[in-house]
Amino acid sequence: ARMPELPHFTRLACLPRDAFYEYGERIPLLDDQGQPNKALDGRVCCDQITPYPPGIPVLVPGQVITPEIIAFLTRIMRMQKSIEMHGLATHDGEPSLRVLAPGELDAMAARSTL
């Protein structure tokens, strides 16, 4: 199977450094039925997610997650080839993404001096 095309870069909701240092929460990549988890749509990633190969980040901290990105990560996970997924954590035995918890983005904006 060939590598799926990388999804387009989406907008940043905040500075990468700010998202990375928030506590966040972990949400599984797949839902209870083993399908791409729609609960991730619109959430803000806290970590850099990089499949290797090719070694090009799919998500960076502060980036908004889209259905296309969720579908891409799911396809990569299901491929038979051995592709390392740097930044994707396992939580309760499930591959998960660390995303900003509710209220963290607003709290960041309130603290911002920009």
Language model regions located:
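Non-catalytic terminal extensions of PLP-dependent enzymes
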Residues: 1-114
